[in-house]
Amino acid sequence: NQFHYFFSDPNPGDIIVFRPNGNEKSHYYVRRVIAVPGDKVIIKNGAVYVNGKLYNETTDVASIEDAGLAVDEIELKEDEYFVLGDNRNNSEDSRYANIGNIKKEYIVGKAWFRIGSIGDMGFLD
């Protein structure tokens, strides 16, 4: 949904579509918002903490093996979002410098429907 974020801001748990660093030549990335502007994020002992509290995962995810940049606390600026892929140990996301924190202007829209193999289709939470 390309219009959703014209009227509201992304929330933790939202699945967004974006182009890293606004690169129009890049393919689209689909990742889950973990933290929003003003939040502080750190990954320790394989778990995500936002503002000092354990992040409440809405899906089953593996313990994180590589905290990347989030080994040290990251404070999000006014227009930044911290995103992670649901496949935590095989995902290019905000933990890595080539993706980093996502600026709102780079967000293309909100994902709302999944199409996969037969039986793996449906609306996203």
Question: For each predicted feature, which ranges?
Answer:
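Soluble "head" domains of membrane/secretory-pathway proteins
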Residues: N1-D125
